[in-house]
């Protein structure tokens, strides 16, 4: 589940958060051969419901995911916790002392969440004091993943911390922002890998972007709306079966939140398509340690979003 790139000898490469692999095996142990291009990549390993977090090395090696299990059939999920800029992961193979059986089927419903660091789950598992740590990211319990689970759907996350629709948090316009991120499977500027949109046909696309665009002040309205219209029309072209929902996200408040909502309304008006709409996001301020929403706030964000998405989709 999520965007991957095929590599040599059956290996796969991936970088977006939330990319997941589901394995079912009959045996007493499970291992994985993998490596990252950086030193800040983390995975969650969920075996028969028990969760542990694994730190990846930049040198390829074997990781024991589970051992001394009771004989029988077991189910595992391996989920990428980290962002693209933490490192690109190569997963070469899984191994077991028994045999692999048919993995669990993914849900038929498909969701795509486009966004920034909030969608990536930045710092939602923070443990201050001290500086921010890469292990604090956890998309597994982010609002998008929680909403997808509540709606009975699989989820693909396309997100990058600090990025926006037209500019990054510091005002730069020469980095990959949302339109380019959407086109990529791996958004590493040194080695970008394209994504074939035919590989995943979402029923619902949720775009939660804008916080970083507004960090330096209000972006010029016409330029912003025009770019959003262009992106939405691209989404409709690539995925005519999908409903598209725009929302402003959780961090903005006050004048900036009101302005972004107005920009979104204007985007929806110009697109003039019944399959494109806007939903409301409440403000969640994070806490004293970090402005990103906490784990508990992500759960509330999902609770806010799910009824609105059910109404849009008729689910």
List each language-model region with its residue ranges:
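Catalytic His-Asp segment of secreted/periplasmic serine-dependent ester chemistry enzymes
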Residues: 250-315
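Short coil-to-beta-strand
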Residues: 110-115, 199-208, 274-279
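Active-site-proximal beta-strand/loop segments in catalytic clefts of secreted hydrolases
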Residues: 114-117, 158-162, 208-212, 247-251, ...
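Solvent-exposed, polar/charged alpha-helical surfaces in well-ordered, non-transmembrane soluble domains
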Residues: 141, 145, 149, 226-233, ...
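N-terminal secretory targeting modules
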Residues: 1-114, 118-139, 314-315
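Conserved SGNH/GDSL esterase-like catalytic core that processes O-acyl groups on lipids
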Residues: 16-18, 84-86, 124, 129-226, ...
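Short, conserved loop/helix-junction motifs that constitute active-site signature segments
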Residues: 106, 236-239
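Proline-centered loop/turn at the N-terminus of a beta-strand
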Residues: 110, 154, 242-243, 277
């Amino acid at each position: 589940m999520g965007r991957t790139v095929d590599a040599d000898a059956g290996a796969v490469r991936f970088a977006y958060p939330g990319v997941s692999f589901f394995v079912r095996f009959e045996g007493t142990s499970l291992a994985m051969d993998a490596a990252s291009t950086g030193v800040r990549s983390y995975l969650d390993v969920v075996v028969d419901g028990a969760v542990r977090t694994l730190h990846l090395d930049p040198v390829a090696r074997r990781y024991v995911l589970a051992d001394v299990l009771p004989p029988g059939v077991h189910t595992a999920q391996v989920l990428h916790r980290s962002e693209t800029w933490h490192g690109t992961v190569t997963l070469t193979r899984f191994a077991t002392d028994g045999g692999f059986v048919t993995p669990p089927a993914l849900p038929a419903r498909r969701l795509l969440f486009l966004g920034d660091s909030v969608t990536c789950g930045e710092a939602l598992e923070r443990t201050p004091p001290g500086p921010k740590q890469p292990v604090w990211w956890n998309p597994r319990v982010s609002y998008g993943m929680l909403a997808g689970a509540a709606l009975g759907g699989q989820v693909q996350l396309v997100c990058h911390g600090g990025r926006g629709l037209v500019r990054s948090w510091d005002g730069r316009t020469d980095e990959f922002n949302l339109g380019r991120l959407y086109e990529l499977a791996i958004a590493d500027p040194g080695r970008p890998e394209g994504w074939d949109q035919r590989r995943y046909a979402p029923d619902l696309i949720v775009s939660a972007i804008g916080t970083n665009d507004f960090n330096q002040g209000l972006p010029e309205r016409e330029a912003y709306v025009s770019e959003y219209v262009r992106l939405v029309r691209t989404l409709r072209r690539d995925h005519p079966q999908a409903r598209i929902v725009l929302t402003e996200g959780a961090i903005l408040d006050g004048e900036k939140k009101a302005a972004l909502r107005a920009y979104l309304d204007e985007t929806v008006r110009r697109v003039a398509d019944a399959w494109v709409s806007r939903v409301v996001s409440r403000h969640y301020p994070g806490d004293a340690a970090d402005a990103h929403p906490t784990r508990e706030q992500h759960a509330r964000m999902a609770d806010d979003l799910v009824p609105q998405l059910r109404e849009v989709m008729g689910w």
